[in-house]
Amino acid sequence: MRLSELSHPNQLHGLTIAQLEDIACQIRERHLQVVSTSGGHLGPGLGVVELTIALYQTLDLDVDKVVWDVGHQAYPHKLITGRYENFNTLRQKGGVAGYLKRSESTFDHFGAGHASTSISAALGMAFARDRLGLNHKCVAVIGDGALTGGMALEAINHAGHLPNTPFLVVLNDNDMSISPPVGALSTYLNRMRHSAPVQFISDSVQESVKNLPFIGGEIPPEIKSLTGSVKRLAVPKVGAVFEELGFTYMGPIDGHDISRMIRTFQAAHRVGGPVLVHVATTKGKGYPYAEADQVGYHAQSAFDLTTGKSIPSKSPKPPSYSKVFGQTLVKICEQNNKVIGITAAMATGTGLDLLQKAIPNQYVDVGIAEQHAVTLAAGMACDGLRPVVAIYSTFLQRAYDQLIHDVGIQKLPVTFVLDRAGIVGADGPTHQGQYDISYLRSVPNFTVMAPKDEAELQRMLVTCLENDGPCALRIPRGSGEGVTLMEEGWEPLKIGRGEILEDGDDLLILAYGSMVTPAVQTAELLKQAGISSTVVNARFLRPLDQALIHPLARRIGKVVTIEEGALGGGFGSAVVESFSDQDLLVPTFRLGIPDKLVDHASPQQSKESLGLTPSQMSKSIMKRYGWDTSDSLFLSNSNTSSA
């Protein structure tokens, strides 16, 4: 059978093991071909090909429900649930999403882009099933990295208290998250990977007892209890934690042996309560480069399949904001041993891998544990350290209570560097960093800022570390502006002070962070239409530089705010509120992300769809303030676009 003919996972039923293994080869071939061309998550999906096939072989996917954690590992799922033909559009505008989306397929039962949610969601579905008197199976598939997340452990704690609720958790243990997992639980799982499978210990004991002459095939109840005791003697070396939490533990089993997994999943489905099947897989399985470098090939841009090397950009790009941050933090840490970098399993993505390599004793990876990362930093700050928590904007949402309760209220000097703030592109709505401006500006005692370029990022990092309270610094995804950088000697900025970049009399443009350069480009286009603009780099969201902004607004009389974040409660809202507080009635036009989700596309395509390119903003501004656009052909013909 060809993979291209597979439109429904139930078509796997009845195929021989040899046929299923052939399907597995075809999945890997298609997976590699598409990701090498358009980019995407590589290693996670390659590692669960056989697991997906074996699991679906034991389910009726017309009624049974499988929830995949995060979605990194769900590409094989997509390929056997009717998306083979469109898979070449992966992560492209209007194409197949990189994560699971309920709106994309009836087989995507729960959308996710953040880790550790699957067990809670699948358990909720099991609750609904039982309440409605239905009889289908509910399964969560979670990686060992995601299992270290507090939410997953909370769900296991709850599920284990429900002995009569049939519920299956499949632990995909590849000894990795995005980076190697950390912590005591990961160490425990690693030991379990190398232990004999528990259910087969128990089965072999029962088989041996059956063959005793005085038993004669049937095992009396008292002897059955003895075999259970033998199993419990083995469990402490393997699944003790899960057994003690109320789960029936099975495994570890080879996650690339389809036949054995089918038998194990079938046995798991026969158990009346919660079951955890521990499956040991290899991240990147079947592609030698991905197996050898499991961190580097977790996700890839387009690459050469033969060499495994990324296809170089047509033109050289400046270093990314993440890299500049990482390099600058290393320099600061070399001079101050009280500065500690903290990541929640995202060292490479945030640039903290540079600190990890250079000064490992000033680097902490807490695993997928954002809440713990924030309060750990708060504790450090209590006793004289200067922690720097580097975290994606979208993931800091998970620790909002800790920001308020543990850091803000106590005014502790913790620095947060929010990477991927703003539009992130192909990862879609679960990863867009569009909310941090709104959720940070209301937290007590915080100073919140964003740089216009990578040189200003360096100065802001120093500013944060010299401040005596909590600070948040947002940086966008991707390359910087290409400005000259200093190796050391960065001067801190004055808190709450912006700067004027352009002077004009017709319009005041207030821009924040990554939208400062597009604002300058927008002003240049307006200038060609005879409209002169004052452009202000706000620098600080909290406190806002009212001493600079208010007199300019009074004098000029027309204001535009530009931000790469949600308009609701955002930078523009802060400006309008400051005007209102001072009874300053000035027309203000806010440009940013409206009340909508930003779907997967390239960053440039997303900005175009939101009207946030300089030519689009120029046209919108002229229309808003009644300036004639009929002769402004430059607005539609201009090639100027935001970076």
UniProtKB/Swiss-Prot annotation:
E.C. code: 2.2.1.7
Role according to the record: Catalyzes the acyloin condensation reaction between C atoms 2 and 3 of pyruvate and glyceraldehyde 3-phosphate to yield 1-deoxy-D-xylulose-5-phosphate (DXP).
Keyword terms: Isoprene biosynthesis, Magnesium, Metal-binding, Thiamine biosynthesis, Thiamine pyrophosphate, Transferase
Biological process terms in GO annotation: 1-deoxy-D-xylulose 5-phosphate biosynthetic process; isopentenyl diphosphate biosynthetic process, methylerythritol 4-phosphate pathway; terpenoid biosynthetic process; thiamine biosynthetic process
Pfam family, one: DXP_synthase_N
Note on cofactor: Binds 1 Mg(2+) ion per subunit.
Gene name of the record: dxs
Chain residues that bind Mg(2+): 144, 174
Pathway this chain belongs to: Metabolic intermediate biosynthesis; 1-deoxy-D-xylulose 5-phosphate biosynthesis; 1-deoxy-D-xylulose 5-phosphate from D-glyceraldehyde 3-phosphate and pyruvate: step 1/1
Sites where the protein binds thiamine diphosphate: 72, 113-115, 145-146, 174, 287, 370
Annotated protein name in UniProt: 1-deoxy-D-xylulose-5-phosphate synthase
PANTHER family according to UniProt: 1-D-DEOXYXYLULOSE 5-PHOSPHATE SYNTHASE-RELATED (PTHR43322), 1-DEOXY-D-XYLULOSE-5-PHOSPHATE SYNTHASE, CHLOROPLASTIC (PTHR43322:SF5)
SMART domains: Transket_pyr
Catalytic reaction equation(s): D-glyceraldehyde 3-phosphate + pyruvate + H(+) = 1-deoxy-D-xylulose 5-phosphate + CO2
Reported cofactor(s): Mg(2+); thiamine diphosphate
InterPro entries cross-referenced by the UniProt entry: Dxylulose-5-P_synthase, THDP-binding, Transketo_C/PFOR_II, Transketolase-like_Pyr-bd, Transketolase_BS, Transketolase_C, Transketolase_CS
Subunit structure: Homodimer.
One Gene Ontology cellular component annotation held by this UniProt entry: cytosol
Gene Ontology molecular-function annotations: 1-deoxy-D-xylulose-5-phosphate synthase activity; magnesium ion binding; thiamine pyrophosphate binding
Family: Belongs to the transketolase family. DXPS subfamily.
